[in-house]
Regions:
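N-terminal accessory segment detector
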Residues: 1-102, 108-124, 134-135, 139-178
Length: 178
């Protein structure tokens, strides 16, 4: 603490851009970066995927309990995926949906600028979306066609709801019920 005779500001009054959200996003960014540097992108994505699956299970259970249902319909899955991202400051929206796929766009990553250069962090979206879709609809394959992490201005995420020629040709991860 500065005394009255000095002009040095008090530490607690310094304009340091640090609060819990920034700290946690930075922590996740650095953990993902360290994993990418130490074990490589593919392995880092695998580690983040495990976390994403657990988080997806928890979020899925919370929405089903709040809605009072045992299983979400296809339209409810789309609504839940958009809503969960909204709640964590993402800006996902449905571009289109049919019996084979739900296609999402996104204008803002919940990790903000901390995701840039850390594509392994996108496995959170892949796994949370994949787990929720598969647990409720039986199957999902998530293809991250464009991501902010890799420099795109927004994300394009396709959640395939059944195996098709198109889904089998698309890069991505498959998820199954159970």
């Amino acid at each position: 603490m500065a005394d009255a005779s000095t002009s040095q500001p008090r530490v607690e009054d310094l304009p340091i851009p640090l609060e819990r959200d920034v700290f946690l996003r930075t922590l996740i960014r650095e953990l993902a970066g360290t994993l990418q540097d130490v074990v490589g992108l593919e392995e880092a994505s695998g580690f983040v995927s495990v976390v994403g699956q657990r988080v997806g299970d928890q979020i899925n259970a919370a929405y089903k309990a709040a809605l009072g249902v045992e299983s979400l319909s296809k339209s409810e899955v789309a609504d839940v995926l958009v809503d969960l991202k909204r709640r964590i400051q993402g800006d996902f929206y449905v571009l289109s949906q049919d019996d084979e796929a739900i296609i999402f766009g996104n204008r803002a990553c919940p990790f903000g600028e901390k995701v840039i250069g850390r594509p392994s962090m996108c496995m959170m979206t892949s796994n949370v979306f994949g787990v929720i879709a598969a647990e409720n609809l039986g199957y999902a394959k998530v293809s991250l066609e464009a991501t902010i992490a890799e420099g795109a201005p927004g994300c394009r995420v396709v959640v395939y709801l059944k195996p098709t020629t198109e889904s089998e040709a698309a890069p991505g991860r498959e998820y199954f019920q159970g």
